[in-house]
UniProtKB/Swiss-Prot annotation:
Gene3D superfamilies documented for this protein: Sugar-phosphate isomerase, RpiB/LacA/LacB (3.40.1400.10)
Description of how the protein assembles with itself and partners: Heteromultimeric protein consisting of LacA and LacB.
GO BP terms, alphabetized: D-allose catabolic process; galactose catabolic process; lactose catabolic process via tagatose-6-phosphate; pentose-phosphate shunt, non-oxidative branch
HAMAP family reported in the protein's UniProt record: LacB
EC number of the protein: 5.3.1.26
Protein name, UniProt field: Galactose-6-phosphate isomerase subunit LacB 1
Family in the record: Belongs to the LacAB/RpiB family.
Record Pfam families: LacAB_rpiB
Molecular-function GO term, any one: ribose-5-phosphate isomerase activity
Top-level EC class as recorded in UniProt: isomerase
Organism whose genome encodes this protein: Streptococcus pyogenes serotype M18 (strain MGAS8232)
InterPro entries in alphabetical order: LacB (IPR004784), RpiB_LacA_LacB (IPR003500), RpiB_LacA_LacB_sf (IPR036569)
Length: 171
């Protein structure tokens, strides 16, 4: 199994520890960078991990930045990626088993290396439990990736704003 991994400069050491762990378990690791502590931008490496997964160069991906929020948002912009930002085993297993997540994201300054490694190991071993409900949910998520001309309409949210002004939504 091939695992793509990427990070920003803040968590290069953590990424290398995770990479070494994966290699010790017999996985092939595709290191998408960054490779040092020179200041860089996490979207670059989230995109690289996502592209490696959707282009089938890797089976799964791991993204790490300081909090995990930025790189996870970036990788989720790659069509075909379903990434979950996790800090615990339950969330990681749910993401894989119910939503067929193909990337997992971490805050390397939030979650310790050993816990990340344990969670990643369980995530890799977990299997998607296909059900009609799960398939429908994943299809709805995938539909959000589609480009719709209506989204470019400057009045796209007008209806909702008017409802807000009329008090139809609760705070």
């Amino acid at each position: 199994m091939k695992i793509a991994i990427g990070c920003d400069h803040i968590v290069t050491n953590e990424k290398m520890a995770v990479s070494d762990f994966l290699k010790s378990k017999g996985y092939d690791v595709i290191d998408c960078g960054t490779y040092d502590h020179t200041r860089t931008h996490y979207p670059i490496f989230g995109k690289k991990v996502g592209e490696a997964v959707v282009n089938e160069q890797a089976d799964l991906g791991v993204c790490i930045c300081g909090t995990g929020v930025g790189i996870n948002n970036a990788v989720n912009k790659v069509p075909g990626i379903r990434s979950a930002l996790v800090r615990d085993m339950t969330t990681a297993l749910y993401a894989k088993e119910e939503l067929n997540a193909n990337v997992i994201g971490f805050g390397g300054k939030i979650t310790g290396e050993l816990l990340m490694c344990d969670i990643i190991d369980a995530f890799i071993k977990a299997e998607y439990k296909e059900t009609e409900e799960n398939k429908k949910l994943i299809a709805k998520i995938a539909h959000l990736e589609s480009h719709h001309a209506s989204q470019e309409d400057p009045d796209f949210f007008t209806e909702f704003l008017e409802r807000w002004d009329r008090g139809e939504y609760h705070d």
